[in-house]
Amino acid sequence: MSDIEQRVKKIVAEQLGVAEADIKIESSFVDDLGADSLDTVELVMALEDEFEMEIPDEQAEKITTVQQAIDYAKAHVKAA
């Protein structure tokens, strides 16, 4: 598991109140993990903070699974 994947799963677990062990990369935030629209907004904000990046609203709407969040972070995270 990559560092980014681990960090995304940790954020998802904290934001949605689910166990990290229950989070699969194909998990949908809404359908599988029980997120509502407010949860998804808070999740995007937490991802922005964690990875020091900005996710435009039109992109945020497309991030609906753990894998999509990981892929977005990998593509947009600032190189250390």
From Swiss-Prot:
O-(pantetheine 4'-phosphoryl)serine PTM positions: S37
Organism: Herminiimonas arsenicoxydans
Protein name: Acyl carrier protein
One annotated GO molecular function: acyl carrier activity
GO terms for biological process, alphabetical: lipid A biosynthetic process
InterPro entries recorded: ACP, ACP-like_sf, PP-bd_ACP, Ppantetheine_attach_site
Domain Carrier: 2-77
Name of the gene this protein is made from: acpP
Biological role: Carrier of the growing fatty acid chain in fatty acid biosynthesis.
Top-level taxonomy: Bacteria, Pseudomonadati, Pseudomonadota, Betaproteobacteria, Burkholderiales
Post-translational modification: 4'-phosphopantetheine is transferred from CoA to a specific serine of apo-ACP by AcpS. This modification is essential for activity because fatty acids are bound in thioester linkage to the sulfhydryl of the prosthetic group.
Pathway: Lipid metabolism; fatty acid biosynthesis
